[in-house]
Regions:
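Positively charged n-region of N-terminal signal peptides that target proteins for export
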Residues: 1-5, 368
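Membrane-helix interface "capping/anchor" motifs
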Residues: 261-269, 311-323
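Sec-dependent N-terminal signal peptides
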Residues: 4-14
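Boundary at the C-terminal end of the N-terminal hydrophobic targeting segment
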Residues: 17-21
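Membrane-helix boundary connector in multi-pass membrane proteins
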Residues: 314-323, 334-346
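Activation targets extended, charge/polar-rich intrinsically disordered C-terminal tails
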Residues: 128-306, 330-334, 341-368
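Glycine-rich catalytic cores of cysteine/serine-nucleophile enzymes that process amide/ester linkages
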Residues: 26-104
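A cross-kingdom signal targeting lumenal/periplasmic-facing segments of multi-pass membrane
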Residues: 69, 73-144, 148-157
C-alpha cells in the first residue's frame, strides 16, 4: 500500500512539473468522462472525471476527484460524521478506463469545445488542484463530490460559469435520486429513511454524473455548444435480475410474521429494532456534518419512544404501555399526513401499516 502511495505521489509531482515545463499544444483535447452505474452503494450513482490527452506531447491523463481510502482509520465513523477526506489524483487514462471496463460500467466522453488558451488555463488549474494543500477535500453527498468538483474547476476557468443546471423542473433531490436505486430495494429504503428535509428541496444544482452528462448536451458557451464531440467509449451490457429477497415483497413477508405471531416477544423485538434505528437517526442529526441528515422527519416512523414502550412491555406496565402507544400512534398519523405526495411513501407504507396494527392492538388490549 505504501509503495502504491509513493508511486502515486511521484506521478503527481512529475505531472505537475511536466505541465509547468511544457505548455500544451493546439491538438490537446479536454473531455469530461462520465462512468455509468454499478451495484455497490458507493457506485449506484456513477462517477465523473476529467481527461486531458495530448498526442504531440505523448500523454493521456485522467483527473479523478473521487478518490478515497478504505483503510482510513475510523472510515465508517468519518463517513457518517461527514468529515471523511476525499482527494484528487492524476494517472494514466488507460488505467482508469481499464478498471471501469473490468467492472462492466459504461464510459462516456464529452470533448469540451475550448480555445487553446482556455485549455491551458484549465490544465494549469487541474494541476494546481493536485498540490498537497489543495488535493484533499471534505466530501458532501450533494454539495461537494466528484461531479461538483469537476463543474467548479471548469467554471472557475471559463467565462460566466457556463455549466449550470438547464433542465430544472419541480423534482426534488430525493426524486432525482430515487430511481438510481431501483432493483436495490433495501439500499433505496435505507437511503430514503436516513435522509431528512434537505433532499426534499427542489433540485436546482447538478450533483450527479448522468445529470451532468445530460446537461452538457444542451449547454452553450460563447454562442456555440460547449461539447464538440460525444463518444461512447464503452457501453456496458448490464442486466437487472429480479431478486425477491432484495425487494419490498421480502419486507412484507417479514412484517406479516410480526402481525400474525402477535406475541409479547415479537412486539419487543419489533419495537426495539425500530426504536434503535430512530435513536441512530437522532444521533446522526446531531453528530453528522451532512446537512442531508438534518431534520429527519422519519424519526416519527422510527420513533425512539419505542424503546420506552419496550421497557414498559417487559415490565407489564399497562398504564404506560397505553399512553406511549397512543403518543406513538398519533406521531405515526402526523407522519402519514406529512408523507403524502413524497416519492418514498410507498416503500415505507408496509412499516407504517404494521406499526399501526401492533400499536392499536396494544391500546385495545389494555382497554379490555
Amino acid at each position: 500500500m505504501t509503495k502504491k502511495i509513493l508511486s502515486l505521489l511521484f506521478f503527481i509531482q512529475f505531472s505537475i512539473s511536466y505541465c509547468q515545463q511544457f505548455p500544451i499544444s493546439e491538438s490537446t483535447k479536454i473531455s469530461i468522462i462520465t462512468v455509468g452505474l454499478a451495484d455497490e452503494v458507493h457506485s449506484l450513482y456513477g462517477h465523473t472525471a476529467l481527461r486531458i490527452q495530448d498526442y504531440k506531447l505523448n500523454f493521456d491523463l485522467v483527473y479523478n476527484y473521487g478518490m478515497f481510502d478504505f483503510s482510513t482509520e475510523n472510515f465508517v465513523a468519518k463517513f457518517a460524521k461527514g468529515d471523511l477526506q476525499y482527494y484528487a489524483a492524476a494517472y494514466p487514462y488507460a488505467d482508469f478506463e481499464y478498471s471501469y471496463r473490468e467492472d462492466n460500467r459504461s464510459i462516456y466522453e464529452q470533448v469540451l469545445n475550448l480555445s487553446t488558451l482556455e485549455k491551458q488555463k484549465l490544465f494549469d488549474k487541474l494541476n494546481t488542484s493536485l498540490l498537497p494543500e489543495n488535493t484533499f477535500y471534505t466530501y458532501k453527498f450533494i454539495d461537494r463530490n466528484c461531479t461538483t468538483k469537476v463543474i467548479d474547476i471548469v467554471n472557475e476557468v471559463l467565462e460566466n460559469k457556463p455549466i449550470v443546471k438547464k433542465n430544472i423542473n419541480s423534482s426534488t433531490y430525493r426524486e432525482v435520486l430515487f430511481p438510481y436505486a431501483n432493483n436495490h430495494f433495501y439500499e433505496q429504503l435505507g437511503i430514503n429513511i436516513i435522509f431528512g428535509q434537505k433532499v426534499d428541496n427542489q433540485a436546482t444544482t447538478i450533483f450527479l454524473p448522468l445529470d451532468l452528462y445530460d446537461n452538457l448536451k444542451v449547454i452553450s458557451y460563447k454562442n456555440k455548444p460547449l461539447v464538440s464531440e460525444t463518444n461512447i467509449v464503452f457501453e456496458a451490457n448490464r442486466t437487472n435480475p429480479i431478486s425477491y429477497l432484495d425487494s419490498i415483497y421480502s419486507l412484507i413477508v417479514v412484517l406479516l410474521l410480526f402481525i400474525i405471531i402477535n406475541k409479547k416477544a415479537t412486539n419487543i423485538i419489533y419495537f426495539t429494532f425500530l426504536g434503535l434505528i430512530g435513536l441512530l437517526f437522532s444521533f446522526m442529526s446531531i453528530y453528522s456534518f451532512h446537512k442531508e441528515l438534518f431534520w429527519n422527519y422519519n424519526i416519527l416512523l422510527f420513533n425512539p419512544l419505542f424503546l420506552f414502550l419496550v421497557y414498559f412491555i417487559i415490565k407489564n406496565n399497562t398504564k404506560w404501555i397505553k399512553k406511549i402507544s397512543i403518543i406513538c400512534l398519533l406521531s405515526l398519523g402526523s407522519y402519514c399526513l406529512y408523507m403524502i405526495g413524497k416519492i418514498h411513501f410507498i416503500i415505507v407504507l408496509p412499516i407504517i401499516i404494521t406499526t399501526s396494527i401492533i400499536l392499536s392492538r396494544l391500546i385495545l388490549k389494555r382497554q379490555n
